[in-house]
């Protein structure tokens, strides 16, 4: 209840403008209850972010992201599908955390998860890691996060299936293959 109440407020105003008193009043709880669980607003925010990041890490296991042959593609597709469904299920949280009042560090942490998994994939393929590969990793991570943020900002007006198809086409065929 505290998390949901906080997130609803966070969608509309920055964290430094939200008070414990306001959260508790809206949630119908005492401030004492809040302080049993959290030291302050920032520890509440940190717990929300860490819970989501742990879930994302478990969904994006590296073995599900490596596509060696065509037989590996269904597992990869399932991983992308699960990620999109997870984001949709927790869209209220992701909208707030990645929205205009959101925490840039949260986006950076998501990027880092993506980039680390891609780096492991590159190494598993015995790919030589050159200077420009850092830019490639940054591009892929930023593009994927950007698509998800846009999907959330537009109230998920396309279905998760269409979004998944779009992401897969861009990843496998390039952005200019989309018509």
Q: Can you name each region flagged by the protein language model?
A:
Residues 69, 74, 88-118:
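Short secondary-structure transition hinges
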Residues 8-15, 90-91, 124, 174:
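Basic, amphipathic alpha-helical hairpins
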Residues 18-19, 95-97, 160:
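Short, hydrophobic secondary-structure boundary micro-motifs
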Residues 101-126, 134-138, 142, 176:
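Amphipathic alpha-helical packing segments from all-alpha helical-bundle domains
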Residues 134, 141-142, 146-179:
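C-terminal peripheral helix-coil segments that are non-catalytic and often amphipathic
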Residues 1-8, 26, 43-63, 78, ...:
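Alpha-helical structural segments
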Residues 9-42:
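Helix-turn-helix
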Residues 61-89:
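Hydrophobic alpha-helical connector segments
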């Amino acid at each position: 209840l505290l998390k949901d109440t906080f997130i609803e407020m966070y969608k509309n105003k920055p964290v430094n403008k939200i008070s414990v008193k306001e959260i508790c009043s809206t949630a119908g709880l005492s401030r004492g209850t809040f302080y049993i669980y959290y030291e302050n607003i920032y520890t509440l925010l940190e717990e929300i972010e860490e819970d989501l990041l742990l879930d994302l890490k478990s969904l994006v296991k590296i073995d599900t992201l490596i596509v060696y042959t065509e037989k590996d593609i269904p597992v990869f597709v399932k991983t992308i599908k699960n990620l999109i469904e997870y984001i949709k299920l927790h869209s209220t949280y992701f909208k707030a955390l990645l929205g205009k009042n959101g925490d840039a560090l949260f986006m950076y942490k998501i990027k880092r998860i993506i980039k680390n998994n891609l780096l492991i994939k590159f190494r598993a393929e015995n790919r030589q890691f050159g200077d420009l590969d850092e830019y490639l990793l940054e591009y892929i991570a930023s593009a994927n996060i950007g698509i998800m943020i846009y999907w959330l900002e537009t109230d998920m007006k396309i279905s998760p299936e269409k979004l998944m198809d779009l992401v897969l086409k861009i990843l496998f065929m390039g952005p200019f293959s989309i018509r």
